[in-house]
Design a protein with these regions (language model features):
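Feature captures the catalytic ectodomains and active-site-proximal regions of enzymes
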Residues: 1-453
Length: 453
């Protein structure tokens, strides 16, 4: 006998632009420029409201934009969850960072060795913040660490595509009193892949560990501006080597400190450093390092963590499981961690009665503007075939966010139209079982794909 499910449909990155239709073309508002007959129909027929998914309403600093991780964490918890960015900022502001016992042990281990800081250098606040790196380097210097290298990952996805030169200028100024050197610069496309495209990680590994890449002739900001002039942008920046070129820079006994606070895009590079049986790409050398992370990326890593996860109880998945009900989490690869790890409070725990389905994201394109439908059709087929087996379904459609990140408006429009068709199919099937649906988003993105200037 089929169940009558409750389905939470998360249209990832489908936001509301305050300028409305009058500003739709100027802002590149794909949600309004697209043809969305089903969205328009249900918006007219059923109750609706708006949600705030940024700033203090989701546990971020005032004025900080939301993101997928934060949105899913708050949705799953059913309350405001103060984010790692907020917690870390507060710790630094209150002068408590230097007193962190794990941090003290880390920098004690780095004395007489080389300390490598690795992470995303921007103020996007989604995966990291460059000011955290400056604060950490200051504590390292005060702790007696002398040899500090920074392997900077440029953003261009959660920030301006050419903002990296400015961030590296600010970073160099902040690091000057610590003696830390920017050794490597590489785009997040290579260093932070999360879809097992190991050939991208290989390029970043070779740069960070072996010093392979274009040798810089000028300071990092000037080198980046020269790349911009050639059409290269931060996200896709190929490795730039600023110190110790063509030598093994990460050596046995060194300390490697990944300072991103968001886990999902850190794991592949982390595993390359940690796993003796790693087979994602040919490492050529495998330095045995003291690996440290700012937050917990995966409990199984068994590495020191500076900020441990918050303990969240009575979250949605737990309550449903405790009631003896069955639940399904389903998304394509790009958003699978969000409906599982993040929705479950930032832990890997899978509750009793919780099933998970991952639909592979396309691997035949470099960027999703080239395939804006992504795997939404396959996700829709999978979920409609399974709906009657579950009491609760958590469903994510990735397209509005992932295509929104590309900034290609025509593709964003196609992504929105694709999702409108897919949501129609899910709604019709759910209602045929006597079920109910809540259609929402975790944060906005494709409602503003162009900068007005």
């Amino acid at each position: 006998m089929n169940k009558s499910p409750v389905v939470l449909v998360i249209r990832d990155g489908w936001g509301i632009q305050p300028g409305g239709r009058a500003m739709a073309q100027v802002n590149g508002d794909a949600t309004l420029l697209a043809r969305t007959p089903f969205h328009d129909e249900i918006y007219a027929r059923y109750p609706h409201s708006t949600l705030s998914a940024s700033g203090e309403d989701v546990g971020l600093p005032h004025g900080q934009m939301g993101n997928s991780e934060v949105g899913h964490l708050n949705l799953g918890a059913g309350r405001v969850v103060y984010q790692d960015l907020t917690r870390i900022n507060l710790c630094i502001r209150e002068g408590r960072l230097a007193g962190n016992a794990v941090l003290q042990e880390t920098f004690a281990a780095a004395k007489g060795k080389r300390l490598h800081f690795l992470g995303l250098v921007s103020d996007g606040g989604v995966h990291s913040h460059w000011e955290h790196l400056v604060a950490l380097a200051q504590v390292a210097k005060a702790s007696g660490v002398e040899d500090i290298l920074v392997h900077a990952i440029t953003d261009g996805r959660d920030t301006s595509p050419t903002g990296g030169a400015g961030y590296l200028t600010q970073l160099a100024e902040g690091l000057a009193p610590t003696g830390a050197q920017i050794a490597t610069v590489v785009g997040r496309y290579f260093a932070m892949d999360r879809d097992k495209r190991w050939e991208r990680n290989k390029l970043a590994w070779d740069a960070i560990v072996l010093g392979r890449g274009q040798r810089a002739q000028k300071a990092a900001p000037e080198e980046l501006r020269a790349r911009y002039a050639l059409g290269e942008t931060d996200e896709f920046l190929k490795p730039l080597i600023l110190s110790h070129p063509d030598e093994q820079r990460v050596r046995d006994g060194d300390v490697v400190f990944f300072f991103n606070f968001r886990a999902d895009r850190t794991r592949q590079l982390s595993v390359a450093f940690l796993d003796a049986d790693f087979a994602g790409f040919d490492r050529e050398v495998w330095p045995r390092v003291h690996y440290v992370t700012l937050t917990e990326y995966d409990r199984t890593y068994g590495v020191p963590v500076i900020f441990l996860p918050q303990s969240l109880t009575n979250i949605l998945g737990e309550v449903v499981s405790r009631a003896g009900l069955k639940q399904l989490r389903i998304a394509e690869t790009e958003k699978y961690p969000h409906v599982t790890y993040f929705f479950n409070g930032g832990v890997e725990q899978q509750f009793e009665g919780e099933d998970r389905v991952i639909v592979p994201s396309p691997k035949d394109v470099a960027t999703y503007d080239l395939k804006p439908e992504m795997s939404a059709g396959e996700v829709t087929r999978e979920v409609t075939e399974r709906l009657g087996q579950y009491d609760l379904v958590i469903l994510n459609f990735a397209n509005p966010d992932m295509v929104g990140h590309t900034g290609v408006l025509e593709a964003g429009i196609k992504a929105v139209e694709t999702i409108d068709d897919c949501v129609r199919a899910v709604v019709e099937k759910t209602l045929s079982f006597g079920g109910r649906l809540l259609i929402t988003a975790d944060h906005g993105n494709c409602e503003q794909m162009l900068n007005p200037d």
